[in-house]
Amino acid sequence: MNLARSLFPALWLALAFGPLQASAQNCQTSSDLDDATRNAITAAGQRLFGMATKGDTASLRQVSIPNLASDFSGIEGTVKEHERDLAAAQATVKGVFLLDGSTPSPHAEFYCGVFGKSGQTANSAVFYLDNLPAGKYSLVLLDANSPQGRTLFSEILQQEGTDWKLAGLYVKSAQVAGHDSDWFLARARGYKAKGQMHNAWLFYTQARVLISPVPFMGTLATDKIADEEQGIQPADLPVGKTVDLPAGAATYKLISMFSQAVGNDLDLIVKYQAADVSNTNQAYQSNVAVMKAITAKYPELRDAFAGVVARATEPTGRDYGTLLAMKDIK
């Protein structure tokens, strides 16, 4: 199993996520752990964070599990991408979890902390992991604050003997285009009230992504957002499926739509299927056609985003992107 496969742009981890037909596994929170175990995990996490702040990927590689160390380009790219955010950053440990995956499971769920009659509480969490190799893992969640802002720095560690080795790393800013989860949540509610369900769904999704340090983690906060957005997902959005977008004589298959910071702006990213992007002139024309069609079909998008980035995407993942400001899409 390749422990350097990317699930999200900054996630290099050998763990996929999904709750289908899952079996419950054993999980302990920081307060459940004895002092020696908690201190060992915390010390390992802080030591790895220190290496990352210095850009010392060579040392990080030396203390990684073999599968990750054998293909370390993802970790190197993540650390390089966030070097300005991490330089001079001071870290605070926000959470430590011990996940006992000694029994292999194709769909494992780790329930951590105390749950109430209605489900999650302020101190609980659930982790959804697919095809997790047998072993004992820990998750260390760090808040890294620097002059650049707040960064969420999350480490997956795997126990080897008495040592805790790096098995995965997820680093992301706590803000997108200068806005945090609360801002996106407030805007989502506003769009929902106005009946702009496409904007509402996109902003609810961004709020949920920002509030969780890793995408395979559920908390009381993420559950509340999911409850709010339940039932408003438009059927014509490419969520877990492709969606046809007619554009003149052509029909494009949309793969995904999501918000993303481009410079200081909040833009909409639209990915669609393309057989070949080597002809960049043709790919550019297709991108422009997609942007015109998407804004014509969903005019509400002009209220929410500064621009659109269309990405023609081959089956291999190679893509070609074009950015246009909303005012230039006519």
Feature roles, as predicted:
Residues 8-19:
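Bacterial N-terminal signal peptides
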Residues 22-54, 170-183:
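Short, low-complexity N-terminal intrinsically disordered segments enriched in polar/charged residues
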Residues 26-31, 43-45, 62-65, 264-278:
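Acidic/histidine-rich, surface-exposed loop or edge segments in extracytoplasmic proteins
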Residues 28-36, 42-43, 58-123, 210-238:
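Short solvent-exposed beta->alpha transition segments
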Residues 50, 179-199:
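Alpha-helical segment of the N-proximal tetratricopeptide repeat
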Residues 73, 80-148, 178, 237-278:
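Surface-exposed, charged secondary-structure patches
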Residues 137-179, 259-282, 292-327:
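Short beta-strand edge/turn micro-motifs at domain boundaries
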Residues 197-214:
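TPR/TPR-like (Sel1-like) alpha-helical repeat modules
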